[in-house]
Regions:
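Acidic-basic catalytic patches of nuclease active cores, encompassing PD-(D/E)XK
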Residues: 1-38
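Eukaryote-skewed repeat-based solenoidal scaffolds used as protein-protein interaction platforms
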Residues: 14, 22-27, 104-106, 113, ...
Length: 140
């Protein structure tokens, strides 16, 4: 009988808490965390890590060690675009963070090639790294 070992997701949760704190302390944004942003197309509830100013979805993807989480990034684009289309949000940003050695796909996800392909399908969703997030969303 196969069993699946539980994965330590505490680093992702810690990262969410850190980003929420940074936004609250170093920006004028209205910040809400773990918001139910509507129903997914399969009927399940869709929770988003952070919602800024009531209309911008932020999905945080922190990867500490190599794993399958990064393979779910294209699916995250789809879910976020559906939330925008179905529930009236303006835009969404996926933020990838964590040590470069933990990501096999990070450079590709941040490449113009990938971004171009995804924007043609999911026009209101983008992907950036942590440094770009800090530069765009926090006081300088």
């Amino acid at each position: 009988m196969a069993t699946s070992a539980s994965r330590d997701t505490s680093t992702g949760t810690n990262y969410e808490t850190e980003v929420e704190s940074l936004l609250e302390q170093f920006s004028d944004h209205d910040v809400q965390s773990q918001v139910m942003v509507g129903s997914k197309r399969n009927g399940g509830r869709h929770y988003c890590d952070i919602v800024i100013n009531g209309d911008e979805l932020i999905s945080l993807k922190y990867q500490r060690v190599q794993g399958t989480a990064e393979e779910k990034i294209p699916f995250e684009f789809m879910k976020l675009q559906h939330a925008i289309d179905d529930h009236g949000y303006k835009s969404a940003t996926i933020v990838v963070a964590g040590p470069d050695k933990a990501w096999k796909w990070k450079d590709y996800y941040l490449s113009e090639e990938f971004r171009g392909k995804m924007s043609s399908i999911y026009p209101n969703v983008r992907i950036i790294n942590h440094e770009q997030f800090v530069s765009e969303y926090l006081y300088q």
